């Protein structure tokens, strides 16, 4: 049977507390987000939010071409 070094107990307490706090913060962040949530309580439905979630392809390609050609430097 392995012997336990009790001098490492504070280390395990600190690391364990850090893991628990990180997990709790992540859970709180995910559950309070307006678009992505772990529960449906307080979740924003798509019909209630008419704004687009993603940038359309033409806007993206326009930004890319502006950067690629260096037009933003010339203006």
UniProtKB/Swiss-Prot annotation:
Residues that span the membrane, as ranges: 7-26
Localization, UniProt: Membrane
A Pfam family that the UniProt record links to this protein: B12D
Domain of life: Eukaryota
Keywords: Membrane, Transmembrane, Transmembrane helix
One GO cellular component term noted in the UniProt record for this chain: membrane
Expression triggers: By removal of nutrients, in a cAMP-independent manner.
Membrane topology: Single-pass membrane protein
Protein name from the UniProt record: Uncharacterized transmembrane protein SSD449
The species this protein was found in: Dictyostelium discoideum (Social amoeba)
Biological classification of the source: Eukaryota, Amoebozoa, Evosea, Eumycetozoa, Dictyostelia
């Amino acid at each position: 049977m392995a012997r336990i070094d009790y001098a490492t107990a504070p280390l395990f307490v600190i690391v364990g507390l850090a893991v628990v706090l990180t997990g709790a913060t992540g859970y709180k962040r995910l559950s309070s987000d307006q678009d992505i949530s772990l529960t449906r309580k307080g979740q924003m439905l798509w019909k209630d939010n008419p704004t687009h979630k993603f940038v359309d392809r033409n806007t993206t390609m326009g930004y890319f071409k502006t950067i690629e050609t260096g037009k933003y430097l010339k203006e």
